[in-house]
């Protein structure tokens, strides 16, 4: 069977085409800015402009005709309303035009589910991106959130810090390079509340320290990463201990960070559990993960009426019953 998935929850538009065990195409285009963040309206305009050429490119790469596709999947949420609506409208149009079934996919769940293409069975997922930071795992037929950010996502915190010091967007790779040259640890707020996290405090203090001119930028970047990532590892380790699961996966755009990978790998080795990171094109926001999750849902008998494809900006991870 073949599924086509459309992702567009934030600044990346992605279209993926997959079978049960293979990615046939996974193409994307990301809206970037030199200064400032991403405006929802700009993201929607970006997606609308590029949907048709990106769809054509995906079909060409996969060497399939749209008529060969068995199901259309799309990211139903959570995300930016205007961007989500562009994607949902496109998915509905394809489904109606070619008489194909359609399914809406939870973006956060898809990030973890795509690891099952690589033999992962039942992991604890550390999902780290711009808008989301969650520690989640399947329990009682739903993906339960064992810990999450109480304010901003770790990726958003890093990008905002980069923007405040004039590095532009996206800031993750730039901050990571600076951090690699850091030599001195500077104390920054470490905020873990129960199983939840907060990154607004560390962001504010890092910017304040930078503006004093008393600290090397490389040292601030290094300390920012070490402190924030240690908090992520702590909560992930607690979730592993609570659930008794023997696999940990790292997903989301921030999974590209080598220091975070290294820290999570060390924790996994100390607990003698499996650690896995998908190829980066399947870590970041992408259409293939939406297609894969949609195909699993479709094979389990899940079908959506067009009326049920309304987008959900605040689509909770534990809102969806997992029957596939």
UniProtKB/Swiss-Prot annotation:
This is tRNA N6-adenosine threonylcarbamoyltransferase. It catalyses: L-threonylcarbamoyladenylate + adenosine(37) in tRNA = N(6)-L-threonylcarbamoyladenosine(37) in tRNA + AMP + H(+). Fe cation binds at residues 107, 111, 127, 285. One of its GO terms (cellular component) is EKC/KEOPS complex. One of its GO terms (biological process) is tRNA threonylcarbamoyladenosine modification. Keywords: Acyltransferase, Cytoplasm, Iron, Metal-binding, Transferase, tRNA processing. Its EC number is 2.3.1.234.
